[in-house]
Amino acid sequence: MRSARVGDFDHDRFQQRYKGVRVENGIYTVVSKENTIELMMGEFYQVPENFNSSPKLSESEALSKTLKHIGAKKYIWESVEREAALKRKKNDPNASYFPKGELLVYEHSLGKSNTKKEFRLAYKFGIASIDPPISRYVYVDSNSGEILSSKDARRYEAGGGDTIPTTPPTPPDTNYGICFPDQTPCIKQGSASTRFSGVKTITTYTAGEENHYELKDYSRGKGIITYSWEFIEDPFMGIYLLNVPIVDINNGWTKFEYHDDYNHDALLDAHWGIEMTYDYFKSVHNRLSYDGNDSKVVNNVHYFNIFVGNNAYWDPMTEEIYYIYCPHNSSTCKSLNLPIILDPTYEDFTSLDIVSHEFGHGINGDLAGFTYDPEPGALDEGFSDIWNVGVNNYVNKVLGMQKNIWLVGDETVPGGGMRSVSNPKSTTVMSPGPNTYYGGLWDSENNEAHTNSLVLSHWFYTLSKGKQGINDHWCEYNVSGINIEKAEKIAYAALYYLFPTSGYTSARTAAIYSAKALYGKFSSEVKSTIDAWDAIGVPADTTSRGGQGMYKPHYYITFVKLSNLERSSGNDCGYKDNSYLHPTVIKGFTYNMVLSSEGEVSIPSKVHKWRVWIDFNRNGSFESSEMVVQDSINDTFGGTLQKSIQIPTSALTGDTRMRVSMKAVQSGESYQLANESFTEGEVEDYSITINNFSI
């Protein structure tokens, strides 16, 4: 699918296919360094060998069933204006919103439990309509015509999901006149009195006319376009909604002109906000627009929907941002008498927090393509909040502003903000949430993405600033902060590893490998990244650990010494990734290894059983011949072992893995396996460097 390089690591992304047919969400990423595979992660589906890949229905027949299911009065491709605008946007005379079905292998959930699943050959359609406003992905069984799934395509700022059907139309751009968008004389710098951020410099477009400046910035990529949705009164059609470009006569967008009952100054925030977000990703991450191809970004401000008030979303079908807000002082909005749209809790939805968050969804979708299942959806929202922090930090540094970088939506919700990244459980925000994976306030019932996303954004805060304490699973942590500038690079690079069905454990793995690629695998940045994930309780992707699940064991490793390695620790809650530590040993040499553990009183008493493996042949697995320690401490309170180990002359040189495992069991129970997890005890993983002897 694509290849990319992060630091010294190469990333090759592959799409699973069955007999040439794409398997939905079957994405795999292979990470390598100097032609040696370091990591493979993704989703691989075991499609039955006898699966029939020949459809009975044609694409047009499947589309007919899809449209019958949607039942819209007018679809987006039936709008001449929308089709013309798309052709201009894509610079392609053949571009169209008319849905094209893709035949694919789809894993279909049977029943509401989602536990029983089967594979179906299905057509996938992206459907957008104007009346009613809908934007959905629909999966149709290619044999029976059954609608397997119909999912909302958009990513919302708050709430959202399948209960909110909205997709607005966008009329065509105004006439460019004698001036083309890419000509510098048409591009001007204006002064804008924004609603939330003070007076700011914005880039506008003259259209080749005098006294004519539009909110169109063609100095950044293929353009940033900002429209205002206005209530238009027509003697024949009555009042209807239309989006129009706002024109200023002197490029001085003043508070006197635009701070009115319809909040026209909010358009200036959206326009400036996307400009700053574009600049952030270009300067910090070397990324051009949301898709890396410098594509046009379109703002639709004050879009109205009677089903939902006060929100914003990124629409992946139209690739535009919509800000749903009916200005509370507008006579038209008041006349509608709908409490949902006149909720005094909210200010306008074009603050920099919201703008950067929604733009971030476009980036998340392009790189990882998260589904909106519970954990992928939470990651999508969490990464967008991370970009919100990054953009606010960027304008604070570049423009000397004082944005509150750790509070999401504090300008849109002046009473305390929507979410707190630094203190997710804060009772002063609109939506408190968890600071620990499956901890207090984790939403297990509804799996609300914005709520559970706070675990990811709080990981980012913890990594950036550092933090010490005890999480909701009673696990102690002490994280050294590495600053926002390093943390945001790790977060961005992690998206190259992730895939549509990624969960929190995958995000942990991706971030750790990103830190290794960017700062070196034995760096302090890697240690902090690991410690931050431990702090928020996201478990490592390991085959062996103590304290199964979220259970904190009462028996744990306290000391490991080998060669130049000495590590003392407390209770690490069953598993500790110490791969940033790497004792150095010499082939053929013998070393004294010291191992200590602690435990509690137990009836019957426990025996601390120890095993240590070193992957001498570097094949990625621990074999029985690679076990270098096996012994027990016959004291329930623990103690210390000293063992002599020899590094074989046949060992391969270079960096490899070492696993230290202590299992607390009753006397007579068997020793643990290298890939075994257990209730009481702990596993620690290390790197180890094997060298040849030299004088």
Each PLM stretch: what is its role?
Residues 38-39, 60-64, 68, 275, ...:
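Solvent-exposed, polar/charged alpha-helical surfaces in well-ordered, non-transmembrane soluble domains
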Residues 97-135, 142-455, 462, 471, ...:
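Extracellular zinc-dependent metalloprotease catalytic-domain scaffold
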Residues 40, 150, 365, 625-627, ...:
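Residue-level detector of high-confidence beta-strand sites
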Residues 506-547, 695:
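Beta/coil-rich, acidic/histidine-enriched accessory regions frequently appended to metallopeptidases
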Residues 434-526:
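Pan-zinc metallopeptidase signature
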Residues 1-166, 293-316, 695:
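Segments that shape or occlude catalytic/ligand-binding pockets
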Residues 540-695:
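A broad "non-catalytic interaction surface" signal
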